[in-house]
Amino acid sequence: MENFPTEYFLNTSVRLLEYIRYRDSNYTREERIENLHYAYNKAAHHFAQPRQQQMLKVDPKRLQASLQTIVGMVVYSWAKVSKECMADLSIHYTYTLVLDDSSDDPHPAMLNYFDDLQAGREQSHPWWALVNEHFPNVLRHFGPFCSLNLIRSTMDFFEGCWIEQYNFGGFPGSDDYPQFLRRMNGLGHCVGASLWPKDLFDERKNFLEITTAVAQMENWMVWVNDLMSFYKEFDDERDQISLVKNFVTCHEITLDEALEKLTQETLHSSKQMVAVFADKDPQVMDTIECFMHGYVTWHLCDARYRLHEIYEKVKDQDTEDAKKFCKFFEQAANVGAVAPSEWAYPQVAQLANVRAKDDMKEAHKPILSSIELVE
C-alpha cells in the first residue's frame, strides 16, 4: 500500500489505546464463543427466511460476511446485555451494514414514505419494510426514551446512506459538511442508546447518565471507527467518501492535516468519555468501559479492517510505537481472535436452501379432501 502513513497510524492507535486504558477482560474464551454462536445462529435463521432472501437481494457471500462482522461487533462490545438482546441487535445492525454497502437509488421507493407511515401501510422500500418488521424485537429490550433514540438514529442512518449514493465529499469551504454527514450515517445515537436495556437499567433513574452517554458515544464510536478503518479505506475505491477525505475537500487541507484533525478529536473524546463517567454510577461506567474495550478488540481482530497486515508489517521493527502497537494487537488477539468456523455455522445460504427445499416439498404434497380426512 503506497504512501500509507504507517508510523503516524501506529502512534495514533497507541495513544488511543493508552488513553482508554485498553484491557479487554469482557469474557472467557468459552463465554465469547457461546455468545457469538447464539447471536449468529438466531440472526442467520432470520436472514435465511424466504422473505428476507427475496427482498434484500444481497449476494450470499456478502450477506454472510456482513452478518459475521456485525455479530462480532455486537457480542464483543455489548458485553453486558442478554444473549437475546445481542441477537436482536445483531439482526438490526446487519440490516444497516447491508444498506451501507448498497448502491440502489432510494428515491423512487421513498416517494410515499410518510403517507405509508401515517396510514400504517408497509413501506415501498424493501429495506424499510424488513427493518420495521424486526424493530419490535429490538425495542422490546428498551424503555421508551432509548427506543426513540434507536428509531430516530436509524432514520438518520438511512438518510446518510442516501447522501453517500452521490459520492459527494462536500464543497470546499463547507466546514460543517463532513461532521454533518458522519453524524448522520454513524448510528452514534442508536449505539449509545442500545447499551441500556431495561432489564439492567431504569432509564428514568439513570436518565442523565444515559443522555450524556448517547451524546458522548455519538462522536467517540464513529471517530474510533474512522481511525481504525483508515488503513482499509486508504486505497479502496468504494471508501473514498470518508470523514478524513471529506475534511481534505471541505477544509482544503492535506491528508496528513485531516488525519491529525481526526486524531486530536478522537483522543479528546476518549479523555472525555473516561473522565465524565469516572465518578458516576459504577454500573454505567462499567458498561461504557466494556463497550470501549470490546469495540477496539473487534476492530483489531475482525478481518474486515485488515489490521493484521499492519501487525505483520511492523512486528520486527524496533520503534517504541511499533512495539506498543504489536503488544496491544497481541493482547486483543489473545481474547478476540476466534475463527468463524468455531461459531458462524451453519451458513445463511445453507439454511436458505434447506428452507427452499422444505417449501418445495410442502407445495407438492397431495391435498386431501374433507371426506378423505374423515375416512
Swiss-Prot record:
One of its GO terms (biological process) is sesquiterpenoid biosynthetic process. It catalyses: (2E,6E)-farnesyl diphosphate = trichodiene + diphosphate. The keyword Metal-binding does not apply. Its EC number is 4.2.3.6. One of its GO terms (molecular function) is trichodiene synthase activity. Pathway: Sesquiterpene biosynthesis; trichothecene biosynthesis. Keywords: Lyase. InterPro entries: Isoprenoid_synthase_dom_sf (IPR008949), TRI5_ascomyc (IPR010458), Trichodiene_synth (IPR024652). The keyword Lyase applies. TS is a member of the terpene cyclase group of enzymes. It catalyzes the isomerization and cyclization of farnesyl pyro-phosphate to form trichodiene, the first cyclic intermediate in the biosynthetic pathway for trichothecenes. It serves to branch trichothecene biosynthesis from the isoprenoid pathway. Trichothecenes are sesquiterpenoid toxins that act by inhibiting protein biosynthesis. Belongs to the trichodiene synthase family. This is Trichodiene synthase. The lineage of its organism: Eukaryota, Fungi, Dikarya, Ascomycota, Pezizomycotina.
